[in-house]
């Protein structure tokens, strides 16, 4: 009985591993039609009795402002070009902070955020964290850094029902994603930790201050020239 159950479990895990590898490989080239987060937000709106229409237009890498690319890295993951999906020192610092009884603080890299937004549900559990680590490793293994950032910029949430750089640029500033200024890019990056609560186009004092910090970090990183560090040597 137990051996039969273990065999079935092993087969299920093998099928899951093979299927997830196949999906991640396909998405290396094919634009994702949607994300788990988008589905979650849509279902939530139905249950709340306020159905929303999702705004999202896939925009290729070359049609997204370099200012936004650097702003997101500056605000969310300054070690993006050098790590392999996990910022261990940041994770250790977050764990120590949380153990001291402070407000729970995360340390997710951009790759981890892509894994979560694309494939997983919201919430905190060891199962979800384990799956997040699995998908993060696969994404780092099979995708280039440019592809990871491209998918992130097309799947990030920037308002109620607003997903991706193009929809965010149109919704908040009335321009295409390719025409975002440095200030606009910094304001969009500033609201990423809480895109429903905060507004990029009508920034609170805190968001404005955070956007200013992001602009300074962008300059320290070297501006758009920083993107050259997302080197092609990581590609298979």
UniProtKB/Swiss-Prot annotation:
It is a single-pass membrane protein. The chain crosses the membrane at residues 12-31. Its EC number is 2.4.99.28. It comes from the Bacteria. Pathway: Cell wall biogenesis; peptidoglycan biosynthesis. The keyword Zinc does not apply. GO terms for biological process: cell wall organization; peptidoglycan biosynthetic process; regulation of cell shape. It is an enzyme of class 2 (transferase). Keywords: Cell inner membrane, Cell membrane, Cell shape, Cell wall biogenesis/degradation, Glycosyltransferase, Membrane, Peptidoglycan synthesis, Transferase, Transmembrane, Transmembrane helix. PANTHER family: BIOSYNTHETIC PEPTIDOGLYCAN TRANSGLYCOSYLASE, MONOFUNCTIONAL BIOSYNTHETIC PEPTIDOGLYCAN TRANSGLYCOSYLASE. This is Biosynthetic peptidoglycan transglycosylase. It comes from Pseudomonas entomophila (strain L48). The lineage of its organism: Bacteria, Pseudomonadati, Pseudomonadota, Gammaproteobacteria, Pseudomonadales. The gene is mtgA.
């Amino acid at each position: 009985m137990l051996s039969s159950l273990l065999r079935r479990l092993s087969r299920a895990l093998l099928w899951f591993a093979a299927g997830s590898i196949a999906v991640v490989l396909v998405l290396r080239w094919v634009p994702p039609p949607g994300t788990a987060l988008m589905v979650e937000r849509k279902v939530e709106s139905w249950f709340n009795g306020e159905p929303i229409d999702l705004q999202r237009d896939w925009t290729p890498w070359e049609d997204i402002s370099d200012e936004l690319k650097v702003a997101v890295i500056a605000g969310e993951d300054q070690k993006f070009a050098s790590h392999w999906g996990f910022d261990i020192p940041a994770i250790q610092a977050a764990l120590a902070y949380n153990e001291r009884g402070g407000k729970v603080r995360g340390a997710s890299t951009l790759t981890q955020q892509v894994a979560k937004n694309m494939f997983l549900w919201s919430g905190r559990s060891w199962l979800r964290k384990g799956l997040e680590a699995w998908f993060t490793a696969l994404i780092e293994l099979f995708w280039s850094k440019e592809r990871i950032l491209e998918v992130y910029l097309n799947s990030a949430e920037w308002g109620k029902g607003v997903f991706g750089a193009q929809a965010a640029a149109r919704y908040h500033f009335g321009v295409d994603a390719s025409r975002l200024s440095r200030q606009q890019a910094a304001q969009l990056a500033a609201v990423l930790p809480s895109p429903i609560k905060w507004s990029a186009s009508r920034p609170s004092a805190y968001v404005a201050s955070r956007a200013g910090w992001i602009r300074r970090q962008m300059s320290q990183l070297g501006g758009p020239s920083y993107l050259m560090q997302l080197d092609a040597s990581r590609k298979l």
